[in-house]
Amino acid sequence: MSRRIVCLRHGQTRWNVEHRFQGHTDIPLDETGIAQAARSASLLASLKPTKIVSSDLSRAHDTALALGRVTGLPVTVDKELRERGGGEWEGLTGDVMAARWPAEYAAFEPPGGETEVEVATRVSAAMLRWVEEIDDDGLLVVVSHGAALRLGMLAVLGLPRESWHTLGGLGNCSWSVLKQGRKGWRVGEHNAGTLPEPVSSDDKPEFQDDGTR
């Protein structure tokens, strides 16, 4: 066996439904999100995780706590696992962002926010730091956010910047599995869950099902 990382996205929030950029804004799970967290926890518990780490934002932390209750594991909080900072876009929908900042929206670079490279560097460093704390056959669960996890995984996998479009987004309470091998990390599963969940996150429109924010 080799080390594995389960990258679990948080459950649904009201702003997910409204297609608003959440970023660092602390929006809680809605009723659907709470149910999604409980459902994913019952499934992921069967994988016998050895450590759970989470973003400090409540939508991710509460999702992680649901898994912690089932497994009996504590949840460690790490601010480095936060979502991409959206700057002036936080709380806005894609239509508003595109109308006010057409050039920035086309490049998907939020004014006053983080770049993709900054997020990828931040999140991947946290993931790799935490995975070093588990045994060689251990399973780390990282509970975070849509854009943060996609970008972090791309950096962990070592994919070149021009190939970052090849990995799709994660639905609410869906997860991906990274496996460590002799030649590095590889994808074992992507966007897994009980049923496919619509993808609406703080990520580029092409990584969402409906092209909105």
Across the structure, where does each feature detected by a protein language model lie?
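Acidic, low-complexity terminal tails and accessory targeting/binding regions
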Residues: 1-3, 84-95, 132, 136-138, ...
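Short glycine/proline- and acidic residue-enriched helix-loop micro-motifs
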Residues: 99-118, 211-213
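Short active-site segment of divalent metal-dependent hydrolases/proteases
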Residues: 13, 148-149
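General small-molecule cofactor/ligand-binding pocket signal
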Residues: 6, 76-78, 188
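Phosphate-coordination/substrate-recognition cap region in phosphate-metabolizing enzymes
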Residues: 39-100, 105
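Short basic (Lys/Arg) and small-residue
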Residues: 145
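Loop-to-helix element that buttresses phosphate recognition and phosphoryl-transfer chemistry
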Residues: 5-63, 112-125
